[in-house]
């Protein structure tokens, strides 16, 4: 998870720049 930073993109298309799995699995 993560906040919807792209406007509706699912988690698997969110950029690691904003969604680092080490920080927010």
From Swiss-Prot:
Keywords: Hydrolase, Protein synthesis inhibitor, Toxin. It is an enzyme of class 3 (hydrolase). GO terms for biological process: negative regulation of translation. Its EC number is 3.2.2.22. It catalyses: Endohydrolysis of the N-glycosidic bond at one specific adenosine on the 28S rRNA. Signal peptide: none annotated. One of its GO terms (molecular function) is toxin activity. Belongs to the ribosome-inactivating protein family. This is Ribosome-inactivating protein velutin. It comes from Flammulina velutipes.
């Amino acid at each position: 998870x993560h906040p919807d930073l792209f406007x509706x993109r699912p988690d698997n298309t969110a950029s690691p720049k904003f969604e680092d799995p080490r920080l927010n699995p």
